[in-house]
Curated annotation (Swiss-Prot):
Name of the protein this chain belongs to: Protein timeless
Lineage start: Eukaryota, Metazoa, Ecdysozoa, Arthropoda, Hexapoda
Compositional bias of kind Acidic residues: 376-390
Protein source organism: Drosophila melanogaster (Fruit fly)
Basic and acidic residues biased stretches: 365-375
Gly residues biased stretches: 291-300
Family (UniProt): Belongs to the timeless family.
Region (Disordered): 254-300, 322-452, 478-555, 1127-1147, 1220-1239
One GO cellular component term: nucleus
Motif interval(s): Nuclear localization signal: 550-560
Extent of Low complexity compositional bias: 273-290, 522-531
The keyword Nucleus appears for this protein: yes
Bias (Polar residues): 338-355, 400-421, 440-452, 504-515
Biological processes annotated in GO: cellular response to light stimulus; circadian behavior; circadian regulation of heart rate; circadian temperature homeostasis; copulation; DNA repair; DNA replication checkpoint signaling; eclosion rhythm
Length: 1398
């Protein structure tokens, strides 16, 4: 009552949706408008306290108002609105706000409690079968109303799936709410089980399978995966594996000897396996012709006696089983198949339609007959299978639309057997139990049990879909092998963290209980541990040809599919247990694998690869591959059912995600308080997904019934895996980055096992030939480090619980490292030696190889003189990898040091060498470990300096490095070490070459090859994608990391896979080389790995790769001739990487500017000219433009080495016009050219003269190069258009302008050889020429200027050029595009634009 008084409007709104009149719920005609209002209030409620939905929960409006409306509304719009509101109300609490933050206050905790109560009561309301049935029927109605679903209808279906997903996601662990029916039950009833049971009764499985395969599946693909994951949420994978193993065993025994299977299983296995077997009557009429001659009459009697006790559906099931054997005594499989069909069809309508039953069953039968008539007699079985499964979707008036699409789609891609077992949903597993207790005689009971077991077995066999029988026995044999590649491996998955190898032993024991010949001696010779249960079965089955066997199983699968006619309607009131749900899901698993799995994985994979804005949790994809691929391999389904999963593309994506998640995990681990659980879970799922992928390849390699296409596909896949260096290196990376403090031991075990399986595949693929094989010994060398072996030792510590296979993986690696590679020293670690001693003392059963290894290592250790303690790994190795320790010991920053750094920076800011001063200050205070680069990176990380300043400081480091490398007694180096005149002359990229020479000199050339390979691979991927090919030509593959980064338009990481590469990233010359080449360092990108910019073109990457050293043309994956031509035609793009190119650019950092007020604005123009020059012209040897310290110029995209389009040529016309019109006697045209082609630098302009000067006198007017035009523009800019006192005599002018011309003429006459000798004169002349520069508020003005006539002439020529070439813009705007000025500098001084020719 209090609630009603507090929220009368809310109560009024919900109560007016409808009311109960007698037994009928009447919907208010205005219900839709009320629902829209409720939805609006729900959407715009308080985003923190969520008061509206809390009020709904308090008023129990979900149960009292929304659910009745959902069950009784007939209007589609009302149903849609109700479902949308329910979806909103059942959203998990975590999606509404930050639970961690809300838990900190009492109000927040109370809010969370009330919202959880709302969710729990909502889930409780959906335990009623009518509520879920309304949602399922609504989906069926939408699908049947129109085969071509509109986007709106697709959205409606997605909302229904979202509602089911939200309901199943709600946890049941809250103690404050208990279902009333749960209190009276001894063990309690799971609401989850009840909802799942109801959904499967309502044929949700068929609906889901249809939605997975229909053309519009992209709309709900992600939601579907989430729903499937929640359906399997509480199902331990080992449970389903055991059930499928039993099923598989029964299948093998029945298909080999029918008579034997009638008697053997009950004798040997009824005690252990009958509960599961007898609850699984998946075959109503599949085996009766061959099995049931002797018991047909007894079954008829028994069935007749119980007609009143079982449901109508149960009657139909029993009668079908009893009738068919009598009708068909010849035992022919084909005959029983057809007869089973024919006898069921007339029987179903008569006996399966009770008065109170919903009409969809009767409609279903009518539709089925219509379908059969329409399809005709041809391929009757196959068509029926498809039709039956999809016709059950609902009481449609247009069933053809619903069934036609998927049937055609499936039949086009798979053979008829693939359409199989829609119907054996675990609905049937529970049919036999009801009649059994009321049977009169125990013998009849036993007969029924036997029959159920044998018939159950027959349909299991069908799932194998044409597998050749001889191999089936081999599959079971190899399960117990200690060879890692066989079936034993799945037991080491993440879900079995406490089971390990033991689970497989359990499986084998349960398998043996239902096998026919446990005592057969043939099983023991080869394999010691598990008995070879199935070996004897190979002999009888080999009598049939493989094709006959395949056909037999196809028939059985068709029949199994038809058993879906007997649904779970008779068990509506059944109370489901966990075992019931497990059996249910076992059946659905087979249907899902046969019908929807490949579609769902393919759809999700496509959405993950697309650059869609919708974020998708990748863990669902990993889970799909991990969880179901093991079942597909266990049942050895035909390759056509998993051909979209076992592809290079899927494995490539998993590899890329492994690298990406490794980096994300480390970045988050460095941030205090970040939640690592999602990253750890995804990381573990990636590893297990790769393991199941490789395990499936290995399993199918041993299957004998594959056709040639499947074998070729597997062979090709193995060759691609052997070429994929990223995959094999991924496990080196993950093992090195293993951290016991955050990772679980199960994750470590999965890493070791998966790596072992991969190595076996690599070893076997080397024998296939056809590709360049890798050298396994070189690869294994990467594991021969102290820390990796330390982690192997951690795993070996638990050798008693690991299981034989995991121990086998560990010992194999140690054997290779200690024996083949001879690096036994890395095994001399306490954790390994102690474990060896324990194994030795415990007499643990080991094969001879491992015993020899232990003995050899211990003996070698005892006889090897001890080394220094530093070589023994300490516990610090377990905290992080070696390079991480190095980084943190050498460059770790305490909070005090970080605070001190800013103070030191302020103190050093006016010093020429800022970083050197900071290093000195740290050193004075006792900290001698700070390197120059680490200080620069820390300055950037703390935002003390901008990216532009960081860029210039790094250039300064380049110069420092070059100075220390090249200092000679004759070189006049300044205090800051910036003397580049001699060394840079004639060598524009000299700094890169110097770094390369030093790296090679230090014997680190292999790291240059590593970097070169990455660049070449990126180049190859870009070329392939540019050509529009998804698959590269030839046998080459695109490496996963480069391919996916480029596809997603992300920068490509330079992954340091092994220890050597990580150490190289701490080697200063290599880091400087990366910086010089334009590769983003980790500090730049805020990441663990350095990165190659994604905007680089293939030509750029190829040019940089050539810089690193000669290319091995034989190993290139592409034709380099085009790229060779491109690099040869435009060398400048590889010699100039913007403002970071040359070491000489750093000379501006320590220049002492004389009169900054007088020259403040000149560097603006110079920086622009420098930028345009660097980007647009081919430089001559000494064209080195310096960057002034007062203006840190930088492009908007840092590091871009691409050339810009050439500068517009209108200035050439200006020069021609000027020379043609001049009347004064001031020299010949070469004067003008000389004056315009000279590049002069004073302070901000650098200290070199353009080489064009020496050629200017002989350059004709028609061959003016871009440098000339740029330089002329520079001078015109200085001299302005508002020159008042200049004469009109051509290049002649006033004293100032003539002094400039004279200066430049001198430079022209001096020639290139005297360039350096002119510098002092140039400096003096330039300074005097600018001494009279005055700044006012509007423009530059001089005492002596050019005349206005010249200005007007220039403007007119400019206008003509503008008319002639409309796309050319002014040079000013062109330079503006190429040059981005620094915002900070603009604020520091008043910027006065130079007027341009107006």
């Amino acid at each position: 009552m209090d609630w009603l008084l507090a929220t009368p409007q809310l109560y009024s709104a919900f109560s007016s949706l409808g009311c109960l009149e007698g037994d009928t719920y009447v919907v208010n005609p205005n219900a839709l408008a009320i629902l829209e209002e409720i939805n609006y209030k729900l959407t715009y409620e308080d985003q923190t306290l969520r008061t509206f939905r809390r009020a709904i929960g308090f008023g129990q409006n979900v149960r009292s108002d929304l659910i009745p409306l959902l069950e009784n509304a007939k209007d589609d719009a009302v149903l849609e609105s109700v479902i949308r509101i329910l979806v909103n109300l059942t959203v998990p609490v975590e999606c509404l706000f930050s639970v961690d933050v809300m838990y900190r206050t009492d109000v927040g905790r109370h809010t969370i409690f009330e919202l959880n109560k709302l969710l729990y009561t909502s889930k409780e309301a959906f335990t009623e079968a009518r509520s879920t049935k309304s949602v399922v029927e609504y989906m069926k109605h939408i699908l049947e109303s129109d085969p071509k679903l509109s986007p709106h209808k697709c959205d409606q279906i997605n909302n229904c799936l979202l509602l089911l997903r939200n309901i199943l996601h709600i946890p049941e662990t809250h103690a404050h709410c208990v279902m009333p029916m749960m209190q009276s039950m001894p063990h309690g009833i799971s609401m989850q089980n009840t909802i799942l049971w109801n959904l499967f009764i309502q044929s949700i499985d068929k609906l889901l399978l249809y939605l997975m395969t229909c053309p519009q599946r992209a709309f709900w693909g992600v939601t579907m995966v989430q729903l499937i994951a929640l359906i399997y949420k509480d199902q331990h994978v080992s449970t389903l594996q055991k059930l499928l193993s039993l099923w598989f065993e029964a299948s093998l025994s029945e298909s080999s000897e029918d008579n034997e299977s009638n008697t053997s299983p009950p004798k040997q296995g009824s005690g252990d396996s009958s509960p599961m077997l007898t609850s699984d009557p998946t075959s109503d009429s599949s085996d009766n012709g061959s099995n049931g001659r002797g018991m047909g009459g007894g079954m008829r009697e028994g069935t007749a006696a119980t007609l009143q006790e079982v449901s109508r559906k149960g009657q139909e099931y029993q009668n079908a089983m009893a009738r068919v054997p009598a009708d068909k005594p010849d035992g022919s499989e084909e005959a029983s198949d057809m007869t089973g069909n024919d006898s069921e069809q007339p029987g179903s309508p008569e006996q399966s339609q009770p008065a109170g039953e919903s009409m969809d069953d009767g409609d279903y039968e009518d539709q089925r007959h219509r379908q059969l008539n329409e399809h005709g007699e041809e391929d009757e079985d196959e068509d029926e299978v498809e039709e039956e499964e999809y016709l059950q979707l609902g009481p449609a008036s247009e069933p053809l639309n619903l069934t036609q699409q998927p049937a055609d789609k499936v039949n086009n891609t798979t053979n008829p057997t693939s359409s199989a077992p829609q119907g054996c949903l675990g609905n049937e597993p529970f049919k036999p139990p009801p009649p059994l207790p009321v049977r009169a005689s125990t013998s009849a009971h036993a007969q029924m049990q036997k029959f159920n077991e044998s018939s159950y077995a027959s349909h299991v066999s069908a799932v194998k879909l044409g597998q050749k029988s001889p191999h089936a026995g081999q599959l079971q044999l190899t399960k117990g092998k200690c060879c890692p590649q066989k079936r034993e491996c799945p037991s080491s998955q993440s879900e079995l963290s406490d089971c390990g190898y033991g689970t497989q032993v359990e499986n084998q024991e349960s398998i043996s209980t239902s096998s026919n010949d446990d005592d057969g001696p043939q099983g023991k010779p080869q394999h010691q541990k598990p008995p070879c249960n199935t070996k004897p079965r190979n002999k009888p089955r080999t009598i049939m040809s493989p094709m006959d066997k395949k056909e037999l199983r196809r028939k059985k699968l068709v029949k199994r599919s038809k058993s879906s006619l007997i649904n779970m309607k008779g068990l509506v009131q059944h109370t489901p247990t966990d075992d019931d749900i497990s059996n249910l899901l076992k059946e659905f698993t087979v249907d899902f694998l046969l019908k929807g799995y490949s579609y769902l994985v393919e759809e999700l994979h496509m959405q993950l690869l697309s650059n869609a804005k919708v974020p998708i949790d990748t863990s669902h994809f990993f889970w799909l591959v991990t969880y179901f691929l093991k079942f597909a391999a266990q049942l050895e389904l035909d390759m056509e059912h998993i051909d979209t999963i076992l592809t290079y593309d899927v494995l490539s994506y998993l590899t890329y995600e492994g690298v990406s998640l490794c980096e994300q995990l480390e970045l988050n681990a460095r941030q205090e308080g970040s939640d690592l659980k999602p990253y750890l879970r995804r990381m573990h799922l990636v590893v297990t997904a790769i393991r199941e992928f490789l395990q499936a390849i290995d399993t199918y390699n041993k299957v004998t019934h594959l056709n040639e296409d499947d074998k070729a596909h597997l062979r090709q896949l193995q060759l691609q895996i052997s070429e994929m260096s990223d995959l094999r290196c991924l496990f080196v990376l993950l093992l090195r980055r293993f951290n016991p403090s955050i990772h679980s031991k199960q994750y470590l075990q999965d890493l070791v096992v998966t790596n072992h399986i991969l190595l076996l595949i690599l070893d076997s693929s080397a024998k296939l030939g056809g590709c360049q094989t890798i050298r396994l010994s070189e690869h294994i060398t990467q594991f021969a480090t102290l820390e990796v072996m330390h982690y192997y030792g951690i795993l070996l510590e638990d050798f008693n619980n690991n299981g034989e296979f995991v121990n086998d993986c560990i010992f194999t690696m140690m054997h290779h490292i200690g024996g083949d590679l001879g690096q036994i020293g890395v095994l001399f670690q306490p954790i390994i030696l102690k474990t060896y001693s324990r194994i030795w003392e415990a007499d643990y059963e080991l094969c001879d190889d491992w015993s020899d290894l232990i003995e050899y290592v211990i003996h070698k250790f005892m006889n090897t003189p001890p080394k220094s303690p530093l070589t023994i790994p300490t516990t610090s190795l377990t905290e992080m990898t070696k390079e991480h320790n190095q980084e943190h010991t050498v460059c770790s920053w305490s909070q005090e040091e970080m605070d001190t750094l800013y103070w030191y920076y302020v103190q050093s800011k006016k010093n020429n060498d800022i970083v050197g001063k900071i290093v000195k200050l740290f050193s004075n205070n006792g900290n001698k470990l700070k390197t120059r680069i680490s200080i620069i990176q820390q300055l950037l990380q703390q935002d003390i300096i901008t990216l532009l300043e960081y860029d210039d400081l790094m250039k300064f480091e380049d110069a420092e490095y070059q100075r220390t490398l090249l200092t000679t007694p004759t070189s006049a180096t300044t205090e800051s070490g910036i003397e580049i005149k001699e060394c840079a002359y004639g060598k524009p990229s000299d700094d890169v070459q110097i770094l390369l020479d030093l790296i090679i000199k230090e014997n680190k050339a292999q790291h240059l090859l590593w970097l070169q390979r990455i660049l070449i691979e990126c180049c190859f991927v870009k070329l392939t994608l540019r050509s529009g090919l998804k698959v590269p030509e030839g046998d080459h593959i695109m490496e996963p990391v480069a391919y996916h980064c480029i596809c997603k338009q992300k920068s490509i990481p330079v992954v340091q896979w092994n220890n050597e590469q990580s150490t190289t990233m701490l080697y200063q010359p290599f880091v400087l080389l990366l910086h010089k080449l334009g590769i983003q360092l980790p500090a730049d990108a805020g990441s663990i790995f350095a990165r190659i910019p994604d905007y680089w073109t293939p030509e750029t990457m190829y040019g940089l790769a050539k810089k690193l050293g000669p290319l091995d043309k034989l190993n290139l994956k592409f034709d380099a001739s085009e790229l060779e031509d491109a690099t040869a035609s435009s060398p400048s793009r590889y010699h100039h990487t913007g403002p970071r190119n040359s070491l000489s650019s750093v000379s501006s950092l320590d220049v002492d500017l004389g009169d900054t007020e007088e020259l403040a604005l000149i560097p603006e123009v110079d920086a622009a000219v420098e930028k345009a020059h660097a980007m647009a012209s081919t430089p001559s040897p000494s064209e080195i433009f310096a960057v002034p310290k007062t203006k840190h110029c930088n492009s908007i995209i840092r590091y871009t080495p691409d050339p810009t389009p050439p500068v517009p040529n209108w200035l050439q016309l200006v020069m021609r016009s000027k020379c043609n019109h001049r009347t004064g006697p001031s020299g010949d045209p070469s004067d003008c050219i000389g004056s315009s082609s000279t590049t002069v630098d004073d302070e901000g302009f650098g200290k070199s003269i353009s080489a064009a000067t020496s050629q200017a006198a002989s350059t004709s007017m028609s061959t003016v190069n871009p440098t000339t035009t740029l330089s002329l523009n520079m001078l015109n800019t200085f001299m302005g258009s508002h020159n008042e006192n200049s004469s009109s005599s051509g290049c002649g002018g006033t004293v100032s302008s003539l002094s400039m011309v004279a200066l430049m003429s001198t430079g022209a006459a001096g020639g290139g050889g005297n360039t350096s000798g002119l510098e002092m004169d140039v400096d003096a002349s330039m300074k005097s020429s600018f001494e009279r520069l005055e700044v006012n508020g509007s423009h530059f003005s001089r005492a002596n200027n050019l005349d206005q006539e010249y200005s007007a002439m220039v403007a007119s020529v400019y206008e003509k050029e503008k008319e002639l070439n409309s796309d050319n813009v002014s040079l000013a705007s062109d330079l503006t595009r190429m040059y981005v000025s620094d915002e900070d500098d603009r604020l520091e001084r008043t910027e006065i634009r130079v007027p341009h020719y107006h």
